């Protein structure tokens, strides 16, 4: 089933009792999620766990065996955010007696995680409001909850910002919403490593989900970047890809990416008004598959809302359509 033998992929050389597992995913990009094991007390804290499925659970156990770690050695599983590639296996691991932790606001999104028709309903309504074509709306309406997401229930532990209780290491939760409303990063004081989930990635910028106009997700994201920037850290261990050895430089790059995108939108709007969907087509002229088109729409709307809240642009209704 798998395209790689165990540990054929490079595992990070992290220090002070931190182990890394590149766990395969059922899609090609990104092809792996980074699972981390942090030594603590008489066992380990696991950060993220991959997608649901017996084969993926077996693969995780093989990796653990290679590290001479048993599932019973895991004292705590922490999910950085509520995406299936990070917490899909959580219920299976909980069945082994491992307590599961998410940020405290996760309880508000459990139903959406378990039923993707609920999760995408707001997006469909929002896309229709901003002149998305019928084919796009039909694609959203056809989405079903995939088996690789698994089902989750209320976590055993609801994390708040600050030092995590009942662990030996000085491990701190940092609330970093933007890519996901529940996203957290973890700071290990002894190594000055930040485990960033999908908040900060080495090669790409995570997409910013947007399905309503009441939340400025891009503002949340940039504020979360600033929060990490101010912490005295040396390395970022991301949810995908290689370690980030120059974290402050990477954060500056990511902020510049969003600045340039907002500038591009403003340049389009200098000479003409556009609907939300027309702006998607301007920013992403190449033909995209269904998934990437959904991401492009949300990313575009996130930037439009951000600019509107900055007072740079505004919406107005003409001929029963919303224009920017």
Residue ranges, per PLM feature:
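Short Pro/Gly-enriched beta-strand edge/turn motifs at strand-loop
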Residues: 15-23, 142-148, 167-169
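A short catalytic or substrate-binding loop motif that flags glycine-/basic-rich loops and adjacent residues
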Residues: 28-30, 159, 177-180
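Conserved beta-strand hairpin/beta-sheet module of binuclear metal-dependent hydrolase folds
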Residues: 8-69, 185-197
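Divalent metal-coordination and catalytic microenvironments
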Residues: 17, 38, 48, 81, ...
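C-terminal regulatory/interaction regions
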Residues: 1-5, 264-324
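Active-site HxH/HxHxD metal-binding segment of metal-dependent hydrolases
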Residues: 52-56, 63-164, 245
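Metallo-beta-lactamase
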Residues: 44, 51-53, 144-149, 170-262
